[in-house]
Amino acid sequence: MIRDNPCGTLDQVKFRRGKSRGVRPKVLAGNWKMHKTQQEAVAFLQEFLGELVDTPSDREVVLCVPYTCLSVLSKSLHGTRVKLGAQNVHWADQGAFTGEISPPMLVELGVRYVIIGHSERRQYFGETDATVNQRLRAAQSHGLTPILCVGETKAQRAAGETENHIFQQLALDLVDVDQTNLVIAYEPIWAIGTGDTCEETEANRVIGLIRSQLHNPDVPIQYGGSVNANNIDAIMAQPEIDGVLVGGASLQPQSFGRIVNYKPL
């Protein structure tokens, strides 16, 4: 369990797994990244909703879309089972932060989920564990559910540093974060957008290790990394995996529909 004052090094932080209280929800989220105009987003949704007619009710379906699509999709999603998500959020409610979007702005648009700490944000835009933590706490303070992304690079995996790196991310990212309103996505960075998928059993092993570091073992933990219609059934057959964070395969209604309608093996 992440204890008080977990701001120091990993060996200063004590972890203990809590007791599970029940069945974890399945959260299937699409991350459109920097794709789709408003017109394209509406056209996608019109077709995608038809894919959900027989989707089991215990599956949470989320679309994390560009800021420019939030308003139009908020109106279009009203009354449907699809939840609206954003791809980032600032930690301040307002201020001189050119180009940023605040939690109240997202809430006003009906956003329910927000991705925080995606590897592309960390790699290309200088996100750190400190700023990730600020964003997590700000999002939760306004009732948003964060999807926290953690994962290792190819070099870290080759060096045997996968566990230490992810544990350090968790120790720093989750300071004062409410684990009852949280989703975590394990994204092996070397598998994102590369077509290389982490073996399902290995993803299950790492996600189990992530869960062992949480004081709430019922936090849903997703897998993200080249998820597609062909591998979703095998991924979701793993007992520790509670959903997926899907990139490219979420851009087409049929492929994302197949993913949310995965068939348990």
From Swiss-Prot:
It catalyses: D-glyceraldehyde 3-phosphate = dihydroxyacetone phosphate. One of its GO terms (biological process) is glycerol catabolic process. Gene3D superfamilies: Aldolase class I. It is an enzyme of class 5 (isomerase). The active site is at 118 (electrophile), 187 (proton acceptor). PROSITE patterns: TIM_1, TIM_2. Pfam families: TIM (PF00121). One of its GO terms (molecular function) is triose-phosphate isomerase activity. Its EC number is 5.3.1.1. Keywords: Cytoplasm, Gluconeogenesis, Glycolysis, Isomerase. Pathway: Carbohydrate biosynthesis; gluconeogenesis; Carbohydrate degradation; glycolysis; D-glyceraldehyde 3-phosphate from glycerone phosphate: step 1/1. InterPro entries: Aldolase_TIM, TIM_sf, TrioseP_Isoase_bac/euk, Triosephosphate_isomerase, Triosephosphate_isomerase_AS. Signal peptide: none annotated. Substrate binds at residues 31-33, 193, 226, 247-248. Its main location: cytoplasm. Homodimer. Belongs to the triosephosphate isomerase family. HAMAP family: TIM_B (MF_00147_B). Involved in the gluconeogenesis. Catalyzes stereospecifically the conversion of dihydroxyacetone phosphate (DHAP) to D-glyceraldehyde-3-phosphate (G3P). This is Triosephosphate isomerase. The lineage of its organism: Bacteria, Bacillati, Cyanobacteriota, Cyanophyceae, Acaryochloridales.
